[in-house]
């Protein structure tokens, strides 16, 4: 018998090809399943309504604000935040059920090891060799309001790691991967610019890209994931390069405007 209740929160837009896998992996675990959709034009909403009545259509304020909206709707003891292109594997699902049965849960938050599934391969190294904080006590937790790469700030306490994998079906195909990488790079450029971060020039952008490839492919052993591991290391290097190039362009555009105003 479970001693703790669980809210699962998901944000969606045009995810009809992936959302059902996500919802199937959590529907039997969740005490409440909360979906916020930001204007899907495909069958995403209809699919979600097969699994929960708690589906809300909203505008799109950015990732952080949308996740916070979903969190504000949660009422259970614990919250699992899962993306539409993710799903719990069986080991993680079972581990979560066992956790909620405990009288006293040791930690206030848990990281979930990522298993990026790409081009038919589930990667276990490289960028996937990390765990993301997605399970946390609801009381006292909040999201940062960043437009991209938002993070949850849980109630003060220790953080554990849940067994199993959070499967991440990150790219529909290579073209989708390129589009997604470009979007995240540009959003990252704008985020850094708003926060006053400096690019320190294009040569440093190149060095950052080289370091990213070395980190993902060598230090985190992306080479052990074969050809797909190489593709992923190159993709992340390109994203980091584009992010700082975008920041450099924004800096120079701001400088040009300041000079024009001073004339």
What is each PLM-predicted segment?
Residues 1-25, 256-257:
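N-proximal low-complexity "stem/linker" segments adjacent to membrane-targeting elements
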Residues 10, 30-39, 56, 84:
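Short beta-strand/loop segment that forms part of the nucleotide-sugar
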Residues 17-20, 42-51, 91-92:
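Acidic helix N-cap motif at the loop->helix transition within catalytic regions
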Residues 25, 37-46, 83:
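A conserved acidic beta->alpha catalytic loop
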Residues 29, 50-52, 131, 155:
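Short, structured coil segments at secondary-structure junctions
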Residues 31, 53, 77, 85, ...:
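Conserved acidic residues
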Residues 31, 45-73:
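Conserved donor nucleotide-binding strand/loop of the catalytic core
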Residues 65-71, 78, 82, 89-253, ...:
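Catalytic-site signature of metal-activated, phosphate-bearing donor transferases
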């Amino acid at each position: 018998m479970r001693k703790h209740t669980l809210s699962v929160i998901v944000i969606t837009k045009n995810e009809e090809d992936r959302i059902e896998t996500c919802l199937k992996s959590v529907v039997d675990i969740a005490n409440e399943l909360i979906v916020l959709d930001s204007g899907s034009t495909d069958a995403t909403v209809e699919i979600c309504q097969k699994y929960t009545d708690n589906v809300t259509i909203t505008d799109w304020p950015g990732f952080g604000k949308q996740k916070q909206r979903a969190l504000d709707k949660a009422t259970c003891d614990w919250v699992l935040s899962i993306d539409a292109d993710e799903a719990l594997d069986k080991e993680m699902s079972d581990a979560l059920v066992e956790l909620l049965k405990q009288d006293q849960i040791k930690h206030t938050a848990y990281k979930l090891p990522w298993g990026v599934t790409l081009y038919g391969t589930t990667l276990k190294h490289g960028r996937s060799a990390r765990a993301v904080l997605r399970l946390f006590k609801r009381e006292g937790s909040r999201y940062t309001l960043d437009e991209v790469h938002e993070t949850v700030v849980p109630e003060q306490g220790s953080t554990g790691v849940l067994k199993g994998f959070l499967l991440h079906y990150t790219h529909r195909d290579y073209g989708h991967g390129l589009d997604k990488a470009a979007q995240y790079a540009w959003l990252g450029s704008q985020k850094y610019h708003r926060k006053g971060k400096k690019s320190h020039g294009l040569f440093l952008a190149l060095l950052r890209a080289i370091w990213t490839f070395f980190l993902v492919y060598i230090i985190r052993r992306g080479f052990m994931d074969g050809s797909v591991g190489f593709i992923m290391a190159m993709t992340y290097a390109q994203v980091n390069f584009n992010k700082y190039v975008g920041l450099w362009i924004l800096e120079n555009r701001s400088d040009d405007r300041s000079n024009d105003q001073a004339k």
